[in-house]
Amino acid sequence: MYLKLLATCVITVILSSCSSASEPKQLQAGAAAANITPSLGSLTIGGFRPIPATHIHDELFARCIVLDDGDTQIAIVVADILGLPKEVCDLAKEQVAQHTNIPASHVLIAATHTHSAATPRGPKGVFWKDEISDYGQFLAQKFSDGIRRAVNNLEPAQIGWGVALEPREVFNRRW
């Protein structure tokens, strides 16, 4: 699903750059990763009941990419988290729009859906609307910071793609 969405965004950037009659513009891309690991004791909710984290096996990241065709910039964030409330994404998009030339409507934020992460919803979990928790505010700031760093890392880029089968990478490991 993320690949289709990324491909759609990339194609949009390419098509918008092809329609210009002026001098050719260079596609630029920038990337950054922001550590979004919560503190020990944060509630992990992937097992459908909150369990406090007692150790960190792997750090959690929000991976950010910015594409710029000279006319339009888009930002994509993929975060290692179970899910993201709209309120957290909206806050991050507001911060991005405030600090960059990227409008909120050009920012895509998605979750990897890991079951080993904390929730930005606070103690009520993901199923009830709640005010943005401290961790949710932390996430929004980290997403915004990651996008700003990706903008600072913009450099000339080319787009390519390929296809390969790797059945050992996609399977249900637990059930």
Predicted features, each with a name:
Residues 4-17:
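Bacterial N-terminal signal peptides
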